[in-house]
Amino acid sequence: MHKIINHPLIKDKLTRMRKVSTVSTVFRTNLEELTQLMVYEATKDLELNEIEIETPVVKNAKGYKLKNKICLIPILRAGIGMVDGVKSLIPTATIGHIGLYRNEETLKPVEYFKKFPKNISESDVIILDPMLATGGSVVEAVNIIKKYNPKSIKFVCIVAAPEGLEYVQKIHPDVDVYIAALDDKLNENGYITPGLGDAGDRIFGTK
């Protein structure tokens, strides 16, 4: 399943991020805020346990808590820019990291870094990456994460190319994908158009 989150605030913030004149600090701030809006939607179906609590007024009141732990896994490096937006909503979430690069001969993603919390098998996992281009990195990230048997896996991104979205859903139809915008296509250089440019460079001001 994939869902395009259609909301005026998302469209406004995404437009600011797309503009070539947007400086790194503004890009990062809007990415963080946009991620909050995206994750609010992506977590609507999380399971809850009913609990009993005491309020200032009554001793026995009904409350709720998340049934499973939450684990955030940003894909390095651009995915790091989305973490704080989620942590502000789910401060108890643990964080793992996956680093992938593309082999220039085979064009396939290769893992160069991986560090996961010990509780990942007890967690609902949310993968974070601003861009879904060819889909190769996301598919490989899911391949790696599935070996740890998490409760569920969701993927949250900002912009996606149709080619990448189709590939992810073909290989991992059980992973729900949440996007702010489905863009037109990949250009001859593999960039999403109209896209955001190189999200990592724009987040960290490295170009």
From Swiss-Prot:
UniProt catalytic activity: UMP + diphosphate = 5-phospho-alpha-D-ribose 1-diphosphate + uracil
Cofactor: Mg(2+)
Cofactor binding note of this UniProt entry: Binds 1 Mg(2+) ion per subunit. The magnesium is bound as Mg-PRPP.
Transmembrane annotation, as ranges: none
Keywords: Allosteric enzyme, Glycosyltransferase, GTP-binding, Magnesium, Nucleotide-binding, Transferase
Pathway as given in its UniProt record: Pyrimidine metabolism; UMP biosynthesis via salvage pathway; UMP from uracil: step 1/1
Taxonomic lineage: Bacteria, Bacillati, Mycoplasmatota, Mycoplasmoidales, Mycoplasmoidaceae
Protein activity control: Allosterically activated by GTP.
Task of the protein: Catalyzes the conversion of uracil and 5-phospho-alpha-D-ribose 1-diphosphate (PRPP) to UMP and diphosphate.
InterPro entries: PRibTrfase_dom, PRTase-like, Upp_B, UPRTase/APRTase, Ura_phspho_trans
Enzyme class (EC, first level): transferase
Domain of life: Bacteria
The enzyme's E.C. designation: 2.4.2.9
Name assigned to this protein: Uracil phosphoribosyltransferase
Protein residues bound to uracil: I192, G197, D198, A199
Family: Belongs to the UPRTase family.
Residues that hold 5-phospho-alpha-D-ribose 1-diphosphate according to the record: R77, R102, D129, P130, M131, L132, A133, T134, G135, G136, S137, D198
GO molecular function: GTP binding; magnesium ion binding; uracil phosphoribosyltransferase activity
